[in-house]
Every structure is written in C-alpha cells, then in structure tokens.
Amino acid sequence: MSRAWAVSKRELRAYFTTPIGYIVLGLYALVTGLGFTAQFLFYAVMSESPINYDFPAVPNFEETFLSPFLTYCGLIFMFIVPMLTMRLFAEERNLGTIELLFTHPLRDRDIVFGKFGAGFILILAMIALLIVEILLIYRYTQVEAAVLALGLVAVSLMGAAFLSAGLFISVLCRNQTTAAVSTFGVFFLFFIIGYFGGELPEENPAPAGWPADYRALAGVVYTVFRTVATKLPIEAHAKELAEGILQPADLLSYVLFSAFFLFLTFRAIEARRWRA
C-alpha cells in the first residue's frame, strides 16, 4: 500500500501544482452553494404555505430538503469527475510517461488504487466543503446525526462510482479532451436511462392480441429492461440513503459498480502490458 500511496501523492501534487485542483474545489463549492440556497428558500416557502404544495402540514425536512439536496450534490460529480479523471491515464499517454509508469517497479494494483485514491481524496475534500454548508443550518433543524451521516455516505459512494467509471475510460483514451468528453457522455447516458426508465409503466406493454407465449416472453424481457433502466443510474440508490433509509442493496450496488469498473481498469492495463 505504500507504493499506492506514493502514486496518490504524485497525483495530488499534480492536481495542486496546476489550476485543476483549485478549479474543481471552487466550482463544486459554488454550484453546491447555489443549490443549497435555492433548495432551502424553496423549503422555506413550502413551510409557510404547505397546503399550496399539497402538504397537509409543514413538510418533512429530510424528504423535501436534505434528500433532494444531497442527491443533487452527488449528481454534480457527473460534471466534476471528468475533469479529475481525464488526466489520470490519458495525460500520461499523451505525454509519453505512461510507459515509464508501467516499467517502474509498481504492480497494477498500486497504479490503479493510487490514482483512484487521489481522485477520491479530492472528492472527500469537496464533501468537507459540503459539510460546512450543511452545518450552517444543522442547529436549527431536527435532523438526526445518523441520517445526515448516511446522506453524506451516499454522496461519497456516488462520487466513488463516477470516479471508477471515469478512471476506466481514461485508460482507453489517448488525450485529456477525449477522456473528459467520453466520460461525461457515458455519465449522461446513465442519467438519461434513469430519467426515462422511471417513466416506464409497470404493466406488460405487449399487445393483448399476441400469442400467450410471445406475450409472456415479452413481459419477462420488458421487466428485466425496466429493472435495469431504473436501477442502473448512479443516483438511483442515493435518494433513500439521503433520507436515512438504510438498505443493504443500495450500498452493495455502489460497491459492485465501483468494483466492476476498477476490475475493467485492471484488465485494460493488463492488456496494454501484453501488447507492449
């Protein structure tokens, strides 16, 4: 792990000897700050006249403010993470230093976990800024510390999931621009799938006039497709976590998503070594 930490320190040094680290932190603080202000003002308006918004009483703070806000903060990583991961491997290839990295006495796991760790440390720094924003109103609310902690864990897991996918895409690209655009494109595709997946009806859309066997098969295929469309998006499992509802399946989905793309990153590096 000491070698992985050495890689992480190298990457962190690169982030903060160039403007990218400061830009990312500043941009995240700005965008989450604007979202925090807008969501809190909207909650205040709803609390003053809940009947106008179909609430019988003052709306629940966790459901109407905390959960949407934390999910929003996690989704911002869809735009931020490509800026972090675009340089992790793509810049190495562009500068010609990736061969030096691979010939250095480092194992693949040292390289992958080191680069992933550097990106995740930056994500944790962004979440620290987020905590400062939440603490401004925490004392005036009745949010339990455990609920808030679980919501922040959800944001962290979203960041890790985005980061692992971006790391894999960076391995495949030759320059930073291609890596950033490709990463955002994949993230946006996940988001669109989830957006339209939530609108899909639950019932079998196959025409009633179809033969029973075909209709049954179409129903199975549609059910699988709808399940994937609603569960695949990275933000799909964060909403309940941000409300303090702990479901092991939600945590496991993020762990498996991140592990899957880290595994693909290992395989991509291994394939590159064989080609070399």
What are these regions (language model features)?
Residues 1-25:
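Aromatic- and glycine-rich beta-strand/loop motifs that create alpha-glucan
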Residues 19-45, 75-80, 185-189, 260:
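Hydrophobic alpha-helical transmembrane segments of multi-pass membrane transport/permease proteins
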Residues 32-37, 56-70, 113-178, 246:
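Secretory targeting signals
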Residues 39-63, 179, 185-276:
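Terminal transmembrane helical anchor/hairpin motif
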Residues 65-91, 126:
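Long, hydrophobic alpha-helical segments
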Residues 81-85, 133, 164-165, 264-265:
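Hydrophobic/aromatic residues in alpha-helical transmembrane segments
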Residues 82-102, 116:
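Transmembrane helix boundary and interhelical loop/hinge segments in multi-pass membrane proteins
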